[in-house]
């Protein structure tokens, strides 16, 4: 396992990764656009990845860049001391697409309830499956 900065994955060459899993990481990253660009850069054409973030279903936009900097303030606002944003569904999809990805939203109806349950994924969760075409 490699421990690296997701916004600067220079240990990986361009187009060198077949598949990635990025689960509940991007909401912690100050520059999530750079992280998404790095994921796109290292992914091989035809490769794919699964991304998951907490999403506010009823929000009309991503909530970020607030003057909330202390861990205590983040706990009060985000419910976790190291989150830096709340995503909404369309905003998250748009950011992934801006990085170059084709984005597919796949849920329990695609994978099946048994698969979700076996992997500890909530039945209302959506997996953002991205592809580099």
Question: Which sequence ranges carry the predicted segments?
Answer:
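Alpha-helical architecture
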Residues: 3, 25-26, 86
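Class I SAM-dependent methyltransferase SAM/SAH-binding core
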Residues: 1-9, 57
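A short SAM/SAH-binding and catalytic strip from SAM-dependent methyltransferases
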Residues: 18-30
């Amino acid at each position: 396992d490699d421990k690296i900065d997701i916004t600067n994955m220079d240990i990986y060459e361009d187009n060198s990764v077949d598949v990635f899993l990025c689960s509940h990481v991007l909401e912690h990253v100050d520059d999530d656009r750079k992280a998404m660009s790095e994921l796109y850069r290292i992914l091989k054409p035809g490769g794919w990845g699964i991304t998951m973030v907490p999403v506010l279903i009823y929000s009309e936009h991503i909530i970020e860049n607030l003057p909330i900097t202390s861990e205590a303030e983040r706990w009060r606002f985000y419910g976790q001391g190291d989150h830096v944003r709340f995503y909404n569904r369309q905003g998250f999809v748009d950011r992934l697409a801006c990085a170059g990805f084709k984005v597919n939203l796949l849920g329990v109806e695609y994978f099946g309830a048994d698969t979700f349950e076996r992997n500890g994924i909530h039945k209302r969760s959506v997996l953002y499956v991205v592809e580099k075409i």
